[in-house]
């Protein structure tokens, strides 16, 4: 049986490492990237069982990642994580696709 795969998209290295370690302990295979462009490449190479994406990225937004996944991999659930969350952003993310929003401390 192959491991389930998770894509983590966050520009903060510490967050990527934390999620990689935590999800790895749950026997999940993790690919972690820091930009929308890197996420686009990763999504072009494989399908994922789950995606965590930050809201603000250096070359775009988590909404772009959600749209990519909704268009190319509509069965993949997405969780948006951010230190800048608000209700409007969460509603927008939910409307964009299969997504939940989680606020983390900065």
Language model region names:
Residues 47-52, 57:
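Active-site beta3 strand of CheY-like receiver
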Residues 41, 63-75, 92:
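Short amphipathic alpha-helix used as the core "switch/output" element in two-component signaling
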Residues 35, 61-64:
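Acidic catalytic/metal-coordinating carboxylates
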Residues 13-31:
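Two-component/phosphorelay signaling modules centered on CheY-like receiver
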Residues 16, 58, 86:
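The feature encodes the CheY-like receiver
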Residues 27-38, 42:
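Short hydrophobic/Thr-rich beta-strand motif most characteristic of the beta2 strand and flanking loop
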